[in-house]
A protein has these predicted regions:
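Long hydrophobic alpha-helical segments that form multi-pass transmembrane helix bundles
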Residues: 1-77
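Hydrophobic alpha-helical transmembrane segments in multi-pass integral membrane proteins
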Residues: 18, 22, 108-114, 160-173
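Structural signature of hydrophobic alpha-helical transmembrane segments
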Residues: 63-73, 118-130
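Cytosolic-side transmembrane-helix boundaries in multi-pass membrane proteins
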Residues: 167-205
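Hydrophobic core segments of alpha-helical transmembrane domains in multi-pass membrane transport
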Residues: 8-16, 75-85, 97-107, 130-137, ...
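Short juxtamembrane and helix-loop transition motifs at transmembrane-helix boundaries
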Residues: 51-63, 79-87, 109-119, 135-145
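Cytoplasmic-side transmembrane-helix entry/capping segments in multi-pass membrane proteins
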Residues: 1-9, 91-99, 124-127, 148-154
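Loop-to-transmembrane alpha-helix initiation sites
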Residues: 4, 121-128, 151, 170-182
Length: 205
C-alpha cells in the first residue's frame, strides 16, 4: 500500500475541513487569504452538468482554487514528460487509467440521458487528483504490478473505481481511495497475468 496515500486518506477522513482549505489571492488588494470553499470538482459534484462556473481552461493551466496537486494539469503534464524522457515511468498505467476513466464517464453521461458533454468530461479529467494520481502515484514501483498485462489491468481497475467513487459516492474525489484499493489487488493481478514458467507442465521423457 502506498504510505503517502494512506496518510492522506486518514487526514481527509479525520480533518476534512483543514484538508480542503486553500489559499486565494486578491489581486486588487495584493493579499493572500486562506478560506474554505468548494473546489471545481466539488462544485461539479454538487451542481452536475448545469454548473457553468467550472472552466476547463482555467483547470488546465491552474488558475483555480484547490488542494495541493489538483490545481494545474499543465504543470503535472510537464513533470510527467520529464519522467517519461528519463524513462522513470512508462505510458501503460497512466494512459490506461485516464482512458478507462474517460470511457466510464462517457457511458455515465449517455446512460443518464444527459448526452455527451465535453466540458463535463474534461472537468473530471483535469479536476481533482486524477492527473496527479495517474502520473505520479499510480506509477509507484513498489505498489504496482510488474507484468505488462498486469499494468493494463491495474490501470483499468483504477479508472473504473475512481469513476464509481466520484459519480456515485458521497465525496467529490476518489483517486486516493481507488489507488489504495487497487494496491491491495496487486498480488492477485500479478498471479493472474504472469506468464507461465518455461517448460512447466511438460511431459517427462
Amino acid at each position: 500500500m502506498n504510505p503517502a496515500l494512506a496518510a492522506r486518506c486518514f487526514l481527509m477522513i479525520s480533518f476534512a475541513g483543514k484538508m480542503t482549505d486553500f489559499a486565494v489571492s486578491d489581486s486588487f488588494r495584493g493579499v493572500v487569504d486562506t478560506v474554505s470553499g468548494a473546489t471545481p470538482l466539488a462544485a461539479l459534484k454538487q451542481n452536475g452538468f448545469t454548473d457553468s462556473s467550472v472552466s476547463v481552461l482555467h483547470m488546465f493551466i491552474g488558475d483555480i482554487q484547490g488542494t495541493i496537486g489538483e490545481t494545474s494539469a499543465l504543470a503535472i503534464l510537464i513533470g510527467a514528460a520529464i519522467l517519461l524522457v528519463f524513462k522513470v515511468i512508462d505510458l501503460k498505467i497512466p494512459l490506461t487509467y485516464i482512458g478507462s476513466f474517460a470511457v466510464f464517464v462517457i457511458l455515465y453521461m449517455l446512460g443518464t440521458g444527459k448526452g455527451f458533454d465535453v466540458n463535463y468530461l474534461f472537468s473530471h479529467i483535469f479536476g481533482g487528483g486524477l492527473m496527479l494520481g495517474a502520473w505520479f502515484m499510480a506509477t509507484d514501483y513498489v505498489t504496482t504490478p510488474i507484468t505488462p498485462r498486469g499494468q493494463y489491468v491495474y490501470g483499468v481497475c483504477l479508472g473504473v473505481l475512481t469513476a464509481v467513487f466520484r459519480l456515485f459516492g458521497g465525496s467529490a474525489e476518489g483517486v486516493s481511495y481507488a489507488i489504495i484499493f487497487c494496491n491491495l489487488l496487486v498480488p492477485m493481478i500479478e498471479r493472474v497475468t504472469r506468464h507461465p514458467a518455461f517448460g512447466k507442465g511438460g511431459k517427462k521423457a
